[in-house]
């Protein structure tokens, strides 16, 4: 039977839920392709000793991948879930001198004022859709713009609503064109979609249909 609604409910303030989610969401080969793409773009945009901010760092999978391959960068991971930050802190222990953890709600709290500058890149994966609406995503894009150094990059790998989908998608899963329009209106340079992953139109699950969006300040 086809899925009429595509979305998921989370309880990230629960330690038990966060641990279970982290175990289920270990990066697959397909998801690692997204990490590879993000890393490739960051090597062009971030100086060797630059600073990266991750929005919604979750259990630290992307952070671990990047810190392993970028041995001199500083990293700030932001998440509203204390249990997720605890999981990430344990996973990233060997990188501890280079990592700062910040607990904040990306929409309701001025996290950008707590981030050490300059920031050369802001990244996020499978997180901003959980904000629930295009307006909330726009708020985060605006705050990211004010945080980035001139020439800095924003890279968002997140679940999207495919243009040909007939199902109802949760509010934070928006069209690629909507992401690009928002970034353009906020003053970003050259907003674009780098790639789309795990496309499924007939019977999509909540873990399919995601894209990598990028823009510069």
Residue ranges and their predicted role:
Residues 1-46:
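Conserved class I S-adenosyl-L-methionine
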Residues 123:
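A conserved beta-strand element that flanks and buttresses the S-adenosyl-L-methionine
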Residues 108-116:
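Short conserved loop adjoining the S-adenosyl-L-methionine
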Residues 138-150:
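A short glycine-rich, Lys/Arg-flanked "PGG" loop and its adjoining helix->strand segment in the class I
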Residues 53, 59-109:
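Class I SAM-dependent methyltransferase SAM/SAH-binding core
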Residues 126-130:
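Short catalytic micro-motifs in class I SAM-dependent methyltransferases
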Residues 213-217:
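C-terminal lobe and adjacent flexible extensions of AdoMet/dcAdoMet transferase-like proteins
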Residues 155-205:
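C-terminal alpha-helical "lid/dimerization" subdomain adjacent to the S-adenosyl-L-methionine
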């Amino acid at each position: 039977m086809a899925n009429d609604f595509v979305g998921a409910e989370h309880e990230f303030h629960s330690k038990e839920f966060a641990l279970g989610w982290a175990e289920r969401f270990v990066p697959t080969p397909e998801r690692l392709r997204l990490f590879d793409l993000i890393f490739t773009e960051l090597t062009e945009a971030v100086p060797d000793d630059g600073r990266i901010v991750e929005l919604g760092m979750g259990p630290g999978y992307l952070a671990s991948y990047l810190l392993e391959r970028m041995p001199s960068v500083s990293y700030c991971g932001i998440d509203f879930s204390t249990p997720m930050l605890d999981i990430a802190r344990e996973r990233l222990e060997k990188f501890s001198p280079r990592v700062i953890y910040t607990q904040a709600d990306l929409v309701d709290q001025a996290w950008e004022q707590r981030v050490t500058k300059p920031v050369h890149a802001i990244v996020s994966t499978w997180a901003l859709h959980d904000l629930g609406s295009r307006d909330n995503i726009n708020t985060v894009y605006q705050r990211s713009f004010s945080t980035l150094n001139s020439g800095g990059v924003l890279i968002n790998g997140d679940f999207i609503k495919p243009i040909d989908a007939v199902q109802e998608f949760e509010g934070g899963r928006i069209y690629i064109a909507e992401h690009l329009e928002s970034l353009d209106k906020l003053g970003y340079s050259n907003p674009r979609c780098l790639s789309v992953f795990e496309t499924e139109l007939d019977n999509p699950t909540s873990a399919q249909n995601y894209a990598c969006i990028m823009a510069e300040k």
